[in-house]
């Protein structure tokens, strides 16, 4: 399948087990090639302080790949969990920013790029790890910064799919009691949509990467 030899001796045992589980979850949705690339995931470490990195906006192909992983999370019955950043496996729990981080981490496998930080809140990504863009420039996999209608504070983040007939479609991880009966009608990673003028949208952006 691949002529290039891959060195995985440095991969920790626990990390290797994660990729075995990832393969069985995604085996009907991803190619074997992406699974093999996943073995390189742990090689993407946090940047060293003595090395100078170059920052760029995430290329479109990286953003689209991140969205594809968001789709897989949505199809894997992922539950919402504040602070969660579980890799894709059984009994997955993840919060809104954790979803974005993990999708981009998977999307960056076998590339020269890494995230600016390995753990970020929605507000941190808005202020420090993204380039703000007009709504008209949104592409699949870009970031939707969101919050309460009555506040300007970014407290939530989603990944953009498309805008069609004035409606913005996206994937996010959240808990919501829509009917007001005390039961969460939404609990986890789902596909959702809002009007493009909804006040819960605070800004739109591209993920910043470095290499």
Predicted feature locations:
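Aromatic- and glycine-rich peptidoglycan recognition patches
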Residues: 49-56, 132, 154-211
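N-terminal capping segments
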Residues: 46-115
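Bacterial N-terminal signal peptides that target proteins for export
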Residues: 12-32
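Short alpha-helix capping/helix-loop boundary micro-motifs
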Residues: 125-134
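Short, well-ordered loop/turn sites that connect or cap secondary structure elements
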Residues: 137-138
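C-terminal motif of bacterial Sec signal peptides marking the signal peptidase cleavage site
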Residues: 42-43
């Amino acid at each position: 399948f691949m002529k290039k030899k891959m060195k995985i001796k440095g991969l920790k045992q626990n990390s290797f087990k994660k990729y075995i589980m990832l393969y069985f979850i995604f085996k009907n949705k991803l190619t074997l090639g992406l699974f093999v690339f996943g073995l390189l995931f742990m090689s993407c470490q946090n940047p060293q302080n003595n090395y100078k990195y170059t920052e760029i906006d995430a290329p479109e192909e990286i953003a689209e790949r991140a969205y594809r992983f968001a789709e897989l999370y949505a199809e894997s019955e992922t539950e919402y969990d504040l602070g969660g950043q579980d890799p894709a496996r059984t009994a997955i729990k993840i919060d809104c920013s954790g979803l974005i981080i993990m999708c981009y981490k998977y999307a960056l496998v076998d590339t020269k790029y890494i995230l600016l930080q390995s753990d970020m809140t929605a507000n941190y990504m808005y202020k420090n790890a993204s380039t703000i863009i007009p709504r008209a420039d949104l592409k699949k996999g870009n970031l939707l910064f969101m919050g309460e209608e009555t506040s300007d504070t970014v407290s939530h983040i989603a990944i953009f799919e498309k805008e069609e007939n004035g409606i913005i479609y996206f994937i996010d991880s959240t808990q919501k009691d829509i009917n007001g009966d005390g039961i969460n009608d939404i609990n986890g990673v789902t596909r959702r949509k809002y009007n493009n003028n909804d006040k819960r949208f605070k800004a739109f952006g591209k993920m910043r990467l470095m290499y």
